[in-house]
Amino acid sequence: MRIILVILSFVLLSSHQVVAEKAPNENLYNDALLTIFSRKLYPQSEQPDYKLIYDTLITTLFFSIDKEIINYYGYPKQFESAKILGITREHEGSFDFNAEVQVTTFEHAHDPHYGKETMTFNISPFGVKTTSFQHEGDKLEQDINEFYKATLSDIKQSFNLNLESYPSYTYNQLQYQAEINNEFKSLFNIAEEIVSSILLPERKIPNKNVIDPVTFIKDNTGYILFKKSDGTNVNYKVQKKDGNWIVTEKNSKQGKKMDYKIPWYVWKKIKPTD
């Protein structure tokens, strides 16, 4: 999943016109780009044109952008429509710059919900460092977050669970952790089986009323929570034994049946919240 999303995002960036929000300062873009690659400066006649400088700078920042999106969402997301909003020089004559970049993230085949991610990178001869990250979601994102929050609240109340001290992972977050950390693979396999055998057959187009499993783990114990389309709340208690996660207990109780409000392709909530 990780490699595919990186390739898709890079293709999307290359197929969309990259634009600046403000009038360009070619010298700043040129100096910022040269700072990344070399301390050596070249005569003006040998410097590339502005469009090449701009596109090269965006390409150079690609993996820094991708890293910050993963840090925020907890898993890779595709993005497009990159914009450099502006570049400033830290000090007159220095090769230390702040570049403000904005991209649009999306969930499935260019469909909503959309996120607007604005990042500021400090570019110096020592490398690229992120200094700020701001996220702005659309109305659908807000609706999905509220749906997930209401669903999880109903499940927790059914089983009288207080999980504030437990780190949580949505389905895609858990999948990403399994890709980069072998200790999560057996845990993700449990969640994947829930989705494929229980939740996927209940999914309807264009909207569904179920959420994918949300996993809460602390040390070697945890819970996997989900709700069926008829409102049944389900709680899997899991435990790590000999390096593998196993289900030690399954419980279910009738809960609130949710309305069909979530687009069928949404596989997780946007940002983890308790």
Segments the model singles out, each with a brief description of its role:
Residues 117-119, 222:
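Residue-level detector of short, conserved catalytic/binding motifs and their immediate flanks
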Residues 119-153, 157, 161, 233-267:
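Short beta-strand edge/turn micro-motifs at domain boundaries
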Residues 104-115, 228-236:
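Short, cysteine-centered beta-strand-loop-beta hairpins and adjacent loop/turn segments enriched
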Residues 1-21:
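Sec-dependent N-terminal signal peptides of Gram-positive bacterial secreted proteins and lipoproteins
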Residues 1, 5, 57, 61, ...:
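Generic hydrophobic secondary-structure signal
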Residues 15-98, 102, 148-231, 252-274:
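Flexible low-complexity loop/turn motifs enriched in small/helix-breaking residues
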